[in-house]
Amino acid sequence: MKVIIPVSPINSLKTRLSEFLSSEERKNLLLNMLRDIKKALEGLDVVVVSRDDEILDFAKYELKAEIVKEKYKGLNNAIKQAFDEIDDEEVIIIPADIPLIKKKHIEDILKLSKDYDLIIASSRGGGTNLLYLKSKNLIELRYEGFSFLKHLEEAEKRNLRYYIYDSFLISVDINTPEDLGEIFIHGDNTYTKNYLKGLGIEVEPKHSSAGRFVVKRR
Amino acid sequence: MKVIIPVSPINSLKTRLSEFLSSEERKNLLLNMLRDIKKALEGLDVVVVSRDDEILDFAKYELKAEIVKEKYKGLNNAIKQAFDEIDDEEVIIIPADIPLIKKKHIEDILKLSKDYDLIIASSRGGGTNLLYLKSKNLIELRYEGFSFLKHLEEAEKRNLRYYIYDSFLISVDINTPEDLGEIFIHGDNTYTKNYLKGLGIEVEPKHSSAGRFVVKRR
């Protein structure tokens, strides 16, 4: 089994955070999120796919991951390229921006994998934040948009035994300043929270249509 | 054991949804969410606390719940009043706006309750969307604000055996049009989704700092 983590290039990274974090800080945020994810994946083989050499170097030397230099456009193609370059059939695909994922989740997935062909956990907004496939070519990958529903549709169409893994912590992907709030609530002892705290970021509760957090920077 | 559901008055209800749903529709949304929650609680005794007679009538006659007419201001006081009016020690407290909760979650909580004094599941934004207490006066209730952290603090202070129950579906509370999006993704076979569909509401994916969904009404 291999865990595949596709990573967007640093310069296109998290532009929705750009009012809040400089480009250098967004890069460091990404690297810290990858450190947290790697910790959850302890003992498993990790493959990082990216077109960005700085990320690939980090993945290789610090995360001790296999690396795949992305050749084609689009997330689905990047993952398929990684599929082609590994021998393993069994894969888990996770994004680079879910730093609240824990070892416990992966242990659950490995247990469930004995009984299911496909295991999926959603992001907020109908995306896919974890996808386990007993065999990498079982379905057509359909990331982007409401991929959670599309992947379930694939599973149904092919009569796969599938399981929906319900996790709030996996659902939290970091795209907006608002999202950083969840790191402050749930991210104790993560690299990501420690990094953000070091930048002087603080979070307060709010309840309005504009969101659930006030995220500020000292 | 009793499950306590505090419910705000209908006229103060979900004002953040008011651009999108009329007052009558927001009321019906609430009643449908309560129907979904009641389904998840099948077989358990439910107590609805509210100052609103229409809600209390619905709770009594349709949900077959015990009812408590709220006398004091504030969510914590409403729950404490319910504590006073029941004989049971063991309680689960859940809000009225988490229609994606499932029977499976409650079964998990009941199993875990053998080993823990306090079980908590967070909302998005650091609130508390499920709280199990082995004995109702074990902690000081501290709803409002980042109550998830405050309740954990209470548990630590008193050396309770506590468990953080990680569920995306429980984390989804319905406060904004954006939140309705999650119902469309995850709410198949719920009263709530069926009701919203009947109103001509539709949801599309979006990825911007303004949110993850485009929620429209035909």
Swiss-Prot record, chains A, B:
The keyword Nuclease does not apply. Belongs to the CofC family. Its EC number is 2.7.7.68. NCBIfam families: F420_cofC. It catalyses: (2S)-2-phospholactate + GTP + H(+) = (2S)-lactyl-2-diphospho-5'-guanosine + diphosphate. It comes from the Archaea. Pfam families: CofC. GO terms for molecular function: GTP binding; phospholactate guanylyltransferase activity. GO terms for biological process: F420-0 metabolic process. It is an enzyme of class 2 (transferase). InterPro entries: CofC, Nucleotide-diphossugar_trans. Homodimer. This is 2-phospho-L-lactate guanylyltransferase. It comes from Methanocaldococcus fervens (strain DSM 4213 / JCM 15782 / AG86) (Methanococcus fervens). Guanylyltransferase that catalyzes the activation of (2S)-2-phospholactate (2-PL) as (2S)-lactyl-2-diphospho-5'-guanosine, via the condensation of 2-PL with GTP. It is involved in the biosynthesis of coenzyme F420, a hydride carrier cofactor. Keywords: GTP-binding, Nucleotide-binding, Nucleotidyltransferase, Transferase. Pathway: Cofactor biosynthesis; coenzyme F420 biosynthesis. The gene is cofC.
